[in-house]
Amino acid sequence: MDLLKSMNRALKYIEENLTNDIDFQEAAKLAFCSEYHFKRMFSFLAGISLSEYIRRRRLTLAAFELKDSNVKVIDIAIKYGYNSPDSFARAFQNLHGINPSKARFNGHSLKAYPRMTFQLTIKGGNEMNYRIEEKEAFRIVGIKKRVPIIFKGINPEIASMWESLDEKAINKLKELSNVAPSGLISASTNFSEGRTEENGELDHYIGAATTKRCPDNFSRLEVPASTWAVFESIGPFPDTLQEVWGRIYSEWFPSSNYEQIEGPEILWNEHKDVTSPSFKSEIWIPITKK
């Protein structure tokens, strides 16, 4: 409940500064968390990125102002953070489907995105199995690719990464594994802004957690010493896993005393048989106490 109140305080600050430069660090302070965690929590709770929410709100208010006043288009563009009439017109057209000058006349349909507030919804109260782990610094060694974000079903780009690993490479990675999570793992990091809108990208690794030197033919990701929240997922793949991932942000973080810090989100699978109805996975997320 306190988290929702603090998030709404941050939203109030953003709403009051839609015609100014928004200080995201100040918004995060009002939410009693880091800027990184604030943006991630907002995205998962709202279903869109913070920057996209701000863009929609500004263009909503701009449409109202165009409709209800005689203020010049260039003045409205500058007021809502656009440096030129052209950039404003493109953004306006993309959202509303018409150019700003036509919005002044009746008969045109415009989109409105109301101010957002977060409210508590009581759901089924299904348990979540998790543990907290402290880990020294290590590195993830393996193959790396920039891939699109996909919410539902199998990500074909990630599937192709797995297919590219021959038996020799898999055995080499398993030999490198000497710290938990053991064996082959996946890791996602460097998420783009569109993470929650399924139009962003991320850096995806398939490899091993290790303290050993990275061979020349593999990529590596250095991971600093961190505290990790480890969540268990048991059920049909990938639906159960994707459900747990969503609940981590919509349920666990809001009710915990932790916030996420920058670092990779790691996935460990018990075995390769994804057809098992009791497929077991673990999600590792780097955290810190608030």
From Swiss-Prot:
Gene3D superfamilies: Homeodomain-like, Regulatory factor, effector binding domain. Keywords: Cytoplasm, DNA-binding, Transcription, Transcription regulation. InterPro entries: AraC_E-bd, GyrI-like, Homeodomain-like_sf, HTH_AraC, HTH_AraC-typ_CS, MarA-like, Reg_factor_effector_dom_sf, Tscrpt_reg_AraC-type_HTH. The keyword Amino-acid biosynthesis does not apply. It is found in: Cytoplasm. GO terms for cellular component: cytosol. The keyword Transcription regulation applies. One of its GO terms (molecular function) is DNA-binding transcription factor activity. Its main location: cytoplasm. It comes from the Bacteria. This is Uncharacterized HTH-type transcriptional regulator YdeE. It comes from Bacillus subtilis (strain 168).
